[in-house]
């Protein structure tokens, strides 16, 4: 049997018996940076496309392409300090992995759902004071179909990004009435995520647009 090494963010005396506190883990480490044998253009991972326009294929991404995806979104999207992001998409999809990397770079807090459930999503939004996230249009639609969803507190949410399918204007307007901006993004596995992004200012004026190319 193989056991996963668990790190706890609590103090030594508050950690569970099966976990090592983060402070103790760091204290046992060397202050000298280890040598890194990886180069910028070395392969980082292979991610498979969804097969929307053909058979799924493996896309090779390097450290450089992954970081440029991060830099592009970070420079153009409406990221703010103290961001609290809900991650609903599966981690094998570029629409989930790239935002996770962006949040780590930005210093944002990411709440990862094991699987999408609209009720659990609303509970997370309310409990963790979520400010943003990325969902496909169907997820956004499921969210407002939850019975009595109006009873949840979503006042912390500033905006949700969406993509992978056309977004009905009525759905965008529904969220705008709730005080939540819906901004469309268009991306590809081949571009490590971003290709086009609509800014929040124009998302109301042009709700059917996914914005300008980067």
Predicted regions and their residues:
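Conserved AMP-binding A3 loop
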Residues: 44-68
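Gly/Ser/Thr-rich phosphate-binding loop
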Residues: 105, 122, 130-135, 144-205
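Structural core segment of the AMP-binding/adenylate-forming
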Residues: 1-27
């Amino acid at each position: 049997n193989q056991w996963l090494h668990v790190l706890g963010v609590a103090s030594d005396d508050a950690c569970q018996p099966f976990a090592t506190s983060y402070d103790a883990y760091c204290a046992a480490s060397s202050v000298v940076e280890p040598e890194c044998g990886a180069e910028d253009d070395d392969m980082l991972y292979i991610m498979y496309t969804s097969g929307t326009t053909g058979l799924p294929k493996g896309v090779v991404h390097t450290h450089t392409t992954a970081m440029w995806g991060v830099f592009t979104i970070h420079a153009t999207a409406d990221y703010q300090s103290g961001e609290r992001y809900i991650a609903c998409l599966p981690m094998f999809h570029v629409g989930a992995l790239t935002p996770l990397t962006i949040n780590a770079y930005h210093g944002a807090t990411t709440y990862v759902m094991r699987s999408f459930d609209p009720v659990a999503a609303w509970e997370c939004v309310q409990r963790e004071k979520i400010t943003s996230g990325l969902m496909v249009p169907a997820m956004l639609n499921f969210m407002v179909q939850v019975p009595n969803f109006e009873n949840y507190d979503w006042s912390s949410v500033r905006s949700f990004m969406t993509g992978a399918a056309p977004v009905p204007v009525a759905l965008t307007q529904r969220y705008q009435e709730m005080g939540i901006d819906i901004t469309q993004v268009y991306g590809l596995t081949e571009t490590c995520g971003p290709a086009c992004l609509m800014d929040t200012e124009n998302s109301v004026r042009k709700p059917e647009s996914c914005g300008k190319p980067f």
